[in-house]
């Protein structure tokens, strides 16, 4: 099932947290009732993945909940922003993260690794993104780095980026 923040099922096409239940789903965390309680809506296990069901019942994974950017009360899937950033020929690698913003809660920030010799400005990124994303999803800031932090299996560590760039 795909559920809202209150644990209510969402209709087809609506994005929410993917929840599971069944005989093979964990009963909880070993000797950690607080974490177990936070991980369930009743008997539905909260996966931490964001997705949606289409009209035919097919499930689409769109993001991780902890990677969701919340700006001005709007949920923004970082993966959606990244797909658009990767369309730019100057971009070798990209990550979209939310950084603290006094007015909006979080601001969409693009962290990019440019191809050798490439140049890219915030204005160029915004112009590219505005036609493909809603205005509130368009990056408000671009930070160029030499490399994105990764775990041993190659996954980008967005938590590390948020910590380092929030200072």
Spans of model-derived segments:
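A structural signal for short hydrophobic beta-strand segments in well-ordered beta-sheet cores
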Residues: 2, 49-53, 96
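Generic non-transmembrane alpha-helical segments
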Residues: 84-90, 128, 132
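Residues at the N-termini of beta-strands
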Residues: 17, 90-93, 141
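Conserved C-terminal "lid"/linker of ANL adenylate-forming enzymes
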Residues: 69, 95-101, 106-116, 122-167
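Carbohydrate-binding surfaces of carbohydrate-active enzymes
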Residues: 5
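Conserved ATP-binding/catalytic segment of the ANL
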Residues: 8-13, 17-79, 84-87, 103-104
């Amino acid at each position: 099932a795909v559920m809202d923040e209150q644990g209510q099922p969402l209709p087809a096409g609506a994005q929410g947290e993917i929840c599971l239940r069944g005989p093979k789903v964990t009963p909880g965390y070993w000797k950690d009732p607080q974490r177990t309680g936070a991980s369930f809506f009743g008997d539905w296990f909260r996966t931490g993945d964001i997705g949606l069901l289409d009209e035919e019942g097919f499930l689409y994974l769109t993001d991780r909940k902890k990677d969701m950017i919340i700006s001005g009360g709007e949920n923004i899937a970082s993966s959606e922003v990244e797909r658009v950033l990767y369309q730019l020929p100057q971009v070798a690698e990209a990550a979209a993260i939310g950084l603290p913003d006094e007015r909006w809660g979080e601001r969409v920030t693009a962290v990019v690794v440019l191809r050798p010799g490439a140049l890219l400005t915030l204005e160029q990124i915004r112009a590219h993104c505005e036609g493909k994303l809603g205005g509130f999803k368009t990056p408000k800031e671009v930070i160029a780095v030499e490399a994105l932090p990764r775990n041993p299996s190659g996954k980008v560590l967005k938590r590390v980026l948020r910590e380092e760039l929030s200072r």
